């Protein structure tokens, strides 16, 4: 029994050292009814990848190798309880840390990340070295770095944005691909702003089912009301324009 406890303790320590890392597991069972899958993580460890932690549209078969993000590891009497995910923003963040040398060595920093798994991720980056373009470093020559990650994520779109401590600049960049005319921070305790965009870019700014503006809000921490330039002119007095 003491030997088994020692093994469990060692197993827990090993898995805890892999928290917030990407690991590859092998599918050993698929629950067709619930959609959950069981992964063998090696060294006697296993974990369940629940349906709600899988990217929409993904399908798995026994024997398949799957990359997952280790969200948490809890030591229990029966061994480590490992929480894994493929939808967590940390998966994308860690992929960039491993793929981009400038992030790995600390020159470029990921300041914020927002993700709707399987559809789109927005990531804000900043460089400690003014000679290093943080966005270019993440994209890579001819898009090589970002394309590799997009491929691993099954075609998920990734917007890489230059982070700024100027919140107006940051919000404007985060709303890309739409071009912003004006950012107005609104008074009050909640972080809110009104963003004006050209009329023909309003639907682009809001995005499919509100996705673009929703990710922008998660990334910046601001509630965002997006309006068209015509709407602004119709509702504001001349001194506000």
Question: What annotation goes with each model-predicted range?
Answer:
Residues 1-233, 241:
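RNA-contacting regions in translation and RNA-metabolism proteins
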Residues 238:
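Extended, polar beta-sheet/loop recognition surfaces of beta-rich domains
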């Amino acid at each position: 029994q003491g030997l088994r406890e020692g093994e469990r303790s060692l197993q827990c320590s090993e898995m805890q050292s892999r928290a917030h890392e990407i690991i590859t597991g092998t599918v050993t069972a698929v629950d067709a009814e619930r959609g959950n899958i069981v992964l063998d993580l090696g060294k006697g460890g296993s974990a369940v990848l629940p349906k709600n932690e899988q990217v929409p549209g993904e399908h798995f078969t026994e024997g398949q190798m799957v990359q997952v993000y280790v969200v948490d590891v809890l030591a229990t009497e029966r061994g480590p309880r490992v929480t894994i995910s493929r939808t967590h923003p940390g998966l994308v963040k860690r992929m960039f840390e491993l793929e981009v040398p400038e992030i790995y060595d600390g020159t470029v920093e990921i300041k914020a990340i927002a993700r709707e798994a399987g559809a789109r991720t927005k990531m804000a980056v900043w460089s400690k070295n003014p000679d290093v373009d943080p966005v270019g470093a993440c994209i890579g020559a001819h898009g090589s770095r970002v394309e590799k990650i997009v491929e691993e994520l099954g075609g998920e779109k990734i917007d890489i944005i230059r982070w700024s401590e100027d919140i107006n600049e940051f919000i404007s960049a985060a709303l890309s691909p739409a071009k912003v005319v004006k950012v107005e921070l609104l008074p009050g305790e909640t972080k809110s702003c009104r963003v004006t965009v050209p009329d023909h870019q309003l639907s682009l700014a809001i995005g499919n089912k509100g996705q673009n503006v929703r990710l922008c809000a998660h990334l910046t921490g601001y509630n965002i009301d997006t309006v068209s330039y015509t709407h602004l002119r119709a509702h504001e007095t001349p001194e506000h324009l």
